Amino acid sequence: MKKEYSVYLLLSHSGSMFSRAINFFTDHPYTHVSIALDEDLDQVYSFGRLNPYNPFFAGFVREDIHHGTFSRFPNTTSAIYELKVTGKQYRSIRREIDRFRSDGHKYTYNFLGIITASFNYPIYRKYKYFCSQFVAEVFLNSGIDLSGKHPGLTSPMDILEYEKLELVYSGYLRNYRQAHLKVAVAG
């Protein structure tokens, strides 16, 4: 029997000016998505702010749910989903993320791509991604098509529609670890 692995998708809405603008145009409850390689959310990756106070200085980031941008916005709402994957898919996802990590300084946020996606026009620019484009591409390159769309057209809510996701938490992100510990102790 093949061993199953789990990866986690963290969907969030920080309430920042940028996330409120996205929410205004999309009317979606979640405006950001990240990949977590562990259930404790210690290894979380996405495209977002490199500096919590400057939304325009953005690129590939390892996020910390209790520091940095998320701590600046303590009322960040979130939904955390678990996705079971094969060992081969898990290793591929890790390799994809390692590819981004090894050249992390080259990557910047795809502001133009997020605008063109709203007109159903994907744009590929080397070393430039927005959060859901990054997540969709990492999974697609690992044999998992989360949205059925081109990564450059994928929104966080498109990813949420993937049928194999299992909700493990919904609420304020700042409360996740405490809620997660209670479940782990009770289980």
Feature annotation, model-predicted:
Residues 1-187:
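Cysteine-nucleophile amide-bond enzymes
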